[in-house]
């Protein structure tokens, strides 16, 4: 005989936000959740109202162990739709709700399973009524070799299967039977309370699904639990929500039809901040997972001031460091950054207790080079007189230097020397053979190879220079010094 489908009414049907989101879906969706090979668009604000783990924007994927069909049923429940399940779909949906932190769906599954447990099978009821016959001598029955052995009884408590093998069947009135019944009831009560009081995201010992948002209950501590998680480590948000305990009033079944789950929003810690927020038992886990994201903090005062003093040395505030010169040269700045960091930090750390000796002032910068020569037209100043004279030709238009190969003229000797490179010749050229020389000394050495009788009358070594100047040059600024003719 097939069992009727199970109907789970959603408590979010009267919520205005959920109704609008369900009506607009998939429009205005800011979240895309990938489960298996399927993507489910959703609204992060609606998901955040029922679960801290689901209220994340962007595109992210759920861990292994949740099928797309189960997640679709969970999503329909969140959006205010009633979910109809087959008997075999109740347990996977409850485990998915427990893993993703949807407490209202998990409680609805518990109530549905409790309603089914109130209607036991007739054969099971008959089997439970058989051992109710009292026995006057329980010790004799326990020692009787012909006693009856009962089959295995499987009890499901809080999602866990515990096999209880009863090799002996003592009567209900016996002390052993009473003790066994009391232990079973206590175990069932403890497991149920543990299930109701466990933080969202913890996982029982029977965990069959490798959902990344779950943490195993391990007496070894948080670090061992994180090491045994299958797959890559979860993000900071999922671990943060899984270790944040809920208050006792949040566990009360006060969420009735027409009331949204406001406690999920009110108790939501900041996702983008210090990992694990205010939870204390996960310090080791945080150091194990986010080793590269930690901010090293020390407890003693001298080490604690180190990072602050480094900031103070780079950007000092008035009164925090000894006042130095207003400006430093690049070499002095480098020396200050590399060699005096420790001294500055120590000085800043003990400034309140004892006066720090002032750092010696660097030598003053050399005075600026004097420029006594000024242009009478524009007022521009120069340190050398010939620089001022060359500049003055800009105003007068005088170009005393001329090229012997072309009509090019220049106001500056250096400019004319550069102009010669356009002709591809040296500044000195032999008047007899036309050979070029780069300097006056090389031209003098070259002319010794010619006979003096070949030289024209009135020839001088200066006539080999290709440039001529219309103004007499001083001996100090002459491009070449006059020399005697070679013989």
From Swiss-Prot:
SMART domains xref list: BTB, ZnF_C2H2
Disordered, as annotated region: 112-206, 220-244, 308-371, 468-487
Name of this protein: Zinc finger and BTB domain-containing protein 32
Its biological purpose: DNA-binding protein that binds to the to a 5'-TGTACAGTGT-3' core sequence. May function as a transcriptional transactivator and transcriptional repressor. Probably exerts its repressor effect by preventing GATA3 from binding to DNA. May play a role in regulating the differentiation and activation of helper T-cells.
Transcription regulation recorded as keyword: yes
Provenance organism: Pan paniscus (Pygmy chimpanzee)
Sequence similarity: Belongs to the krueppel C2H2-type zinc-finger protein family.
Molecular function terms, GO-annotated: DNA binding; DNA-binding transcription repressor activity, RNA polymerase II-specific; RNA polymerase II cis-regulatory region sequence-specific DNA binding; zinc ion binding
Basic and acidic residues composition bias: residue spans: 112-166
GO CC, alphabetical: nucleoplasm
Listed GO biological process terms: regulation of cytokine production; regulation of immune system process
Source organism superkingdom: Eukaryota
Entry keyword set: DNA-binding, Metal-binding, Nucleus, Repeat, Repressor, Transcription, Transcription regulation, Zinc, Zinc-finger
Biased composition regions of type Pro residues, renumbered to the chain: 357-369
Pfam families from the UniProt entry: BTB, zf-C2H2, zf-met
